[in-house]
Amino acid sequence: MVNAQPCNVLMVCSRFEAETFWSFKKTSAAVGAKHTSPPLGLITVAALLPPAWSVRLVDRNIEELTDDDLDWADLVFTGGMLSQGADALDIVDLCRARGKPVAIGGPGITSSPHACPAANFRVLGEAEGVIDQFIEAWEAGEREGVFEAEKFKVDVTKTPIPRFDLLKFDDYLHVGVQFSRGCPFTCEFCDIIELYGRVPRAKTNPQMLAELEELYRLGYRGHIDFVDDNLIGNKKAVKAFLPELAKWLEAHDYPFEFTTEASINLADDHELLMLMNRANFVGVFVGIESPDPATLVAMRKKQNTRRNIAESIHTIYAAGLFVHAGFIIGFDSETQSAADAMVELIEEAAIPVCMVGLLYALPNTQLTRRLEKEGRLHPPHERKDRHGIVGADQCTLGLNFETLRPREEVLADYVHILKRVYDPAAYAGRLLRLAKLLANCSRRQPSRRSAGKREMLHRIMANMPEPRELFGRTLTQCAASNPAAARRILILMTLYMDLGPFSRDVIAHIENMIAELAPGAIEPRAHLERASSTLAM
């Protein structure tokens, strides 16, 4: 690598084609951003390249890929998650048409390695495990190849600081960093343990603080998301890191606040919750999936059983962290009471933001292997028109298998949940209850956006969906009941600018699917298989 010849590398982040639950386009626009977060994977790969190689980044979620960009490049890197698959294929085709060698990598192609034969190079698995081989092959003049990393063997303590200097910070709601990879649990539907293993590998404390120092040096201030799939998967490591993070924050006058994802057993560890509080963590995503213990056991998510889930969420609130939660409908063991039980849990726990989706059998998971063995998995179909499914995401692409309950019953339950959970009054009510439950919120808040707070508040309220008066009144009541939590309540309220309209779009889409299941309608499986082909990439 030391003697590598100069090479112009164009990193192209593929576009999330569909409107997804996490798009938050209206929220981003309200605060002057264009997209939620930058491509941490690509800028990490950029840091692994030889110093002699020049690197540029084009994120198609915020800007267009131009002819000048491609003219400059000697080599193009692209890829991403399954939901970016259609655009990644378009990028590969464009590069091949322009005679530009292109490499594709990331979790999408790793899960479905045969999905993109047109790419010159396919990089499968964690890039650190094969990047030296790739560079050597390129330097030797090779222009085709497949490079596959040995699973779960990458030493993340040797991963360099991502190339944060390639980012345009103001274009994003927040930036991401990663402390660890892997999760110790065995959820049947999850692909994380297939991609990164069940033994979480963590970076060192100095290494992680160096990444934050670089962001600070580059002038970034504000929200940072730890993108770990389970930050507390290695409790020993994270408990050693958080006190050091708290010291760093104090020494730098609290430039950042953090969110992350963690398993619900976080609520069982008061010490860990207080460490996160002192390290300026303000929110956490928790996968709840189902309120039914039998369903949780069947999906191998036993960590969510033997507990009162609402009380566990309230314990996290008491430590000053709000909770976003994930729920899934469509499991084999569900009963006709599944929908009402899910809504009741969401209301009792007072979780405003709930990602409720249809079960989808992701490539290379325990669930997919079981359904395939049982003869219930719908076969993937190659989609010739890649843009024919714009607007579909995990909320509408699910159930790519034969359900045990009648399909129309599962879909009707899904509509019922979304209508109740994202009714404006219900959402506002959960905000009010959350404001009373959030404690320990009196912490330093970083300032980032140039627009004045009053101006931003007016912009947000002007863009809230109807009934605006309800949300204005709710914000006033929340601020009166818990002034220290008012800013966080405002953030969660702002998200309804996207979640309200998005839920109504999903409801309309699912109701059309139910109509197609009526006697004399077209075969429903064909509809779902056309949609599922995007995720099969």
Regions found by a protein language model. Give the residues of each.
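Radical SAM enzyme core and accessory elements
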Residues: 1-11, 54, 69, 382-537
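Acidic, low-complexity intrinsically disordered segments
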Residues: 2-220
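Conserved beta-strand positions
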Residues: 11, 78, 226-228, 286, ...
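Flexible glycine/acidic-rich beta-alpha junction loops that bind and position SAM and/or redox cofactors
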Residues: 16-22, 111-114, 185, 235-236, ...
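Short, hinge-like loop/turn segments at secondary-structure boundaries
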Residues: 28, 73-75, 119-123, 140-141, ...
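Structural detector of well-ordered beta-strand residues that form the stable sheet scaffold
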Residues: 103, 123, 146-148, 259, ...
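Structural recognition of alpha->loop->beta junctions
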Residues: 114-133, 275-283, 343-356
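Radical SAM [4Fe-4S] cluster-binding motif and immediate context
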Residues: 158-324, 329-344
